[in-house]
Amino acid sequence: MDVGSCSVGNNPLAQLHKHTQQNKSLQFNQKNNGRLNESPLQGTNKPGISEAFISNVNAISQENMANMQRFINGEPLIDDKRRMEIGPSSGRLPPFSNVHSLQTSANPTQIKGVNDISHWSQEFQGSNSIQNRNADTGNSEKAWQRGSTTASSRFQYPNTMMNNYAYASMNSLSGSRLQSPAFMNQQQSGRSKEGVNEQEQQPWTDQFEKLEKEVSENLDINDEIEKEENVSEVEQNKPETVEKEEGVYGDQYQSDFQEVWDSIHKDAEEVLPSELVNDDLNLGEDYLKYLGGRVNGNIEYAFQSNNEYFNNPNAYKIGCLLMENGAKLSEAALAFEAAVKEKPDHVDAWLRLGLVQTQNEKELNGISALEECLKLDPKNLEAMKTLAISYINEGYDMSAFTMLDKWAETKYPEIWSRIKQQDDKFQKEKGFTHIDMNAHITKQFLQLANNLSTIDPEIQLCLGLLFYTKDDFDKTIDCFESALRVNPNDELMWNRLGASLANSNRSEEAIQAYHRALQLKPSFVRARYNLAVSSMNIGCFKEAAGYLLSVLSMHEVNTNNKKGDVGSLLNTYNDTVIETLKRVFIAMNRDDLLQEVKPGMDLKRFKGEFSF
């Protein structure tokens, strides 16, 4: 039922007419073999009759229904200004079955009856009293059309009368005042009366005034209307000085906002090297907002306090040897941490530290290290490429787009400059969206690839990343496979291919790609973690647990021939791995193992059951 049809300011005959038709149908059925349960909608197409209301017969008294019947049969009409339209409305709502096409009605005629009631809303919505209250009811018809369960915060009464019949289309309906206490009392009193004597009824006008007064007293509608009218008058009579004051406050707010924004932009320029925020990129202030958001939220690299390589002048060389010999990435990271502690401007140490941490499933530390590298060497291609990937992994897509732009400008300055000159219209526009930025950068990289005589696997990587950010995994897979045809022994690319296959719901193929990456680099922690996730997706939980335990074991390091602060390592950086392991044990119904999973746990507890 439309919310507007409940208003006392509109024609109260509408409610009486609906219920009188219901009672008339029931009386007709009583005369025909007493078939009280037969629906009046069966075999009829009368508008305005709803089977949904049959469950609530005698919603008003028999006395009022008889009077209403006299009116319908040709008794004197009330004034034309309050006349209701008996014919069907042309502005009828679409059938509920069209709104919720995935649900099937158990009784189509019942749903049709519910729909037929909606023709009353067109008359009631034309009333001035309702139009003056459109803040509460103006969107009620739209709410019905989209299957909303709430029409107005002021009219949220449960309509239990409708629920039993419209369940196939809507779970519940709100916005009806038919179940307010006043009407509930009328329903109960109406059931006790059997006969109707038309000659003993009061005049029609007295009945309507009585009904309207009763509803107004119980629901306080008149008070609400008066309050809203008073508020409207106050707003119309508001002095001009108040409006001027509001304008002054608005200007002050704008001034304060601009001051804060300029401060944020200045902070971004101080943190990043000038090459990353200068006007050469010409990407507009809106983009710098996205990039600045990442920069302003940047955290310093979190060093491990217990590090045996501190004060070792050969820490960088030791780290390189550990990586070349396939040692644990966590141990190599400690060596590089010691190297940058010893020499904070060591560009290669920061770069390798960032590469190690991103492969070691410690993304945030990797991002911090790579950003430090770019501060020292803004044109470091490897740092820019890896940082763009990490930004995408962490959801900083806009920052990744700018990093890819800077990477292409650095590696192919002449070609990239020519491409950007041909398409500088976009660069001068402001207010572009994430999708626009993606499409623009992708178009430029495609032009760059077409200008090269041979396939550059790094260009294919960048294109794959751009397609990845808009969930176009098929094109992402094509790009990564093209790169692997040029360099088939790139374990990082095999891992990226596996991630794309996994996101395409091709877990079996993803597992093969991860295995290939681990064959090329057994210490590749991220590939091992991704392998565990894909194993979970196909229900191989025991194998997944083994891979996750391997990841945790590879984060353990020995310091001074003693176990290091493994618990701190796990608790600080490997919460994701621990939580994933918990989910695996839950899926296996192994509460005994679940209780053992915590930071600093002894992995030997799991050796007997899992292979890692």
Curated annotation (Swiss-Prot):
UniProt xrefs under InterPro entries: PEX5/PEX5L, TPR-like_helical_dom_sf, TPR_rpt
One BP term from GO: protein import into peroxisome matrix, docking
Keyword Membrane attributed: no
Protein name (database record): Peroxisomal targeting signal receptor
Organism per entry: Saccharomyces cerevisiae (strain ATCC 204508 / S288c) (Baker's yeast)
Annotated region (Amphipathic helix 4 (AH4)), positions in chain: 257-273
Region spans: Amphipathic helix 3 (AH3): 158-174
Leftover remarks: Present with 2070 molecules/cell in log phase SD medium.
Residue windows of the TPR repeats: 64-97, 313-346, 347-380, 381-418, 419-456, 457-490, 491-524, 525-558
Residue numbers of N-acetylmethionine PTMs: 1
Assembly and oligomerization: Interacts (via WxxxF/Y and LVxEF motifs) with PEX14; promoting translocation through the PEX13-PEX14 docking complex.
Coiled coil: none
